[in-house]
Structures are given as C-alpha cells and as structure tokens.
C-alpha cells in the first residue's frame, strides 16, 4: 500500500519517544522467555451502564507494535513500569496491521 512506509516510520518514532512509550517484557502464556517490546500504556477509568446504574472500573490498555509482539493472546503477561499486566480478550489491530491495542488487567 502506498504511503505505508511513511506510517510505519511515524509509528516507529512514536514508540521510540521516551515520553510516550516505555520498555516492556512480553511473556506468551505468562511464562519465560520474556521478549522485549516498547509499549504505550494507558490507564483510565471506564464507565459501563447497566440499566439505570453506572459502574466505573479501572482499565489498562496497551498499544504495541505488531513487529515486536506478533501474536498476543489472552493469558499473556506484559511487565512495564513496575506493573505486571495480564492480557484479556482478543487484541485489535489497526487498519495497517502495525499496532495492536490490547486490554489488560493487573496480575
């Protein structure tokens, strides 16, 4: 796809920026060997509605390059910034298949 290299280069720049991304360790199935990967961690509250009630829960969402974490799946672990996170659910890829968005929960 034309221009894909431009997007890949921009993604690489974002993940190289220490104010945006941090070093992480991915463990498939939660076991060694640990594979290094740069990750963008977002910690935010999520509001869920159930009837007339609203629930607020903490969430952890990682973004990681497909090139560094080719096959994330539920049960994998990611260690970053002193936190150990467990991947839950199926990861979502962006349109160009350059970045995974991965929902996690604390270990």
Map each language-model feature to its residues.
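Short, conserved turn/kink motifs that form compact alpha/beta structural patches or helix kinks used as
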Residues: 19-107
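Active-site-proximal polar cores
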Residues: 1-31
């Amino acid at each position: 796809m034309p221009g894909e290299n431009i997007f890949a280069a921009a993604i690489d720049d974002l993940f190289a920026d220490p104010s945006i991304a941090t070093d992480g360790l991915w463990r498939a199935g939660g076991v060694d060997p640990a594979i290094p990967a740069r990750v963008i961690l977002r910690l935010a509250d999520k509001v869920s509605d159930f009837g007339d009630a609203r629930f607020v829960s903490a969430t952890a969402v990682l973004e990681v390059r497909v090139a560094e974490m080719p096959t994330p799946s539920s049960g994998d672990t990611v260690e970053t910034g002193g936190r150990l996170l467990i991947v839950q659910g199926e990861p979502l890829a962006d349109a160009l298949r350059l970045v995974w968005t991965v929902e996690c929960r604390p270990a």
